A protein has these predicted regions:
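Short beta-strand scaffold segments in enzyme catalytic cores
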Residues: 50-57, 118-122
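Short acidic/polar alpha-helix capping motifs at helix-coil junctions
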Residues: 16, 41-44
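Structured interaction and signal-relay segments at domain junctions
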Residues: 62-74
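Short, charged/polar surface micro-motifs in flexible loops or helix N-caps
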Residues: 59-60, 97
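Short, flexible loop/turn motifs enriched in small residues
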Residues: 44-50
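Acidic/polar N-terminal loop/beta-strand segments that form early-domain functional surfaces
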Residues: 57, 67, 94
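Active-site-proximal loop/helix of nucleotide/amide-processing enzymes and allied scaffolds
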Residues: 1-27, 75-195
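Short, basic/aromatic recognition patches
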Residues: 32-42
Length: 195
């Protein structure tokens, strides 16, 4: 159970808590659990640094990373996927400041790594201990210039995040991406025949 990032100056008991994140699971179709969110945020408070986890669609933690106060390195994760579709991996990370709105680097990572979704969680500043979060995802649509569009929701209370049907969202997005990919392939074939 490897922890990615700068961990050499982290106390051993905190490293053990980070390693324990690998043992937690999330129900299929649910973004996260209170237990996972709370543990990630407690470690974030102890370190003053971002913590990120990658989960697959079955809710298994695949990777844990530690960053600094503003960012966490999100390495590529090898996964099998059809061309143009999402990776089957979602990223949940903490924002030590409590401002869980997704940043430009968050959206850039979502687009580059083609996560199912990108979530940021934190403790709400005005209500001690209340967890809030934001979620970013592909819409399955393209702008006029061909750029794949992203959307986000939040900040939302943790209980609202748990009601998002992730399976439905991902299935809908992948269907749109597949339809667009099929149309693009048909357009290319048509152009090839006309040439």
């Amino acid at each position: 159970m490897q922890i990615n990032g700068e961990i050499q100056n982290i106390k051993q008991y905190i490293v053990k808590r980070l390693e324990a994140l690998y043992e937690l699971t999330v129900p299929i179709g649910q973004l996260s659990t209170h237990e996972l969110n709370a543990e990630m945020l407690e470690v974030t408070e102890l370190l003053g640094r971002e913590v990120a986890v990658y989960l697959n669609r079955r809710g298994k933690v695949l990777q844990v990373s530690v960053g600094d106060t503003d960012t966490v390195d999100l390495p590529e994760f090898k996964s099998r996927r059809a061309e143009g579709k999402l990776t089957g991996i979602r990223c949940i990370h903490t924002h030590p400041s409590g401002d869980t709105r997704l940043s430009e680097p968050d959206f850039s990572s979502l687009r580059r790594l083609r996560f199912d979704c990108m979530a940021a969680i934190g403790f709400r500043a005005d209500k001690a201990g209340e967890i809030v979060g934001s979620l970013g995802f592909f819409t399955g649509d393209c702008a006029e210039d061909g750029t794949e569009q992203l959307s986000s929701v939040g900040p939302l209370p943790e209980r609202a995040l748990h009601t998002i049907n992730l399976t439905y969202l991902i299935t809908t997005i992948n269907k749109k991406l597949s339809a667009r990919s099929t149309k693009s392939t048909e357009d290319e074939e048509e152009r090839a025949l006309l040439a």
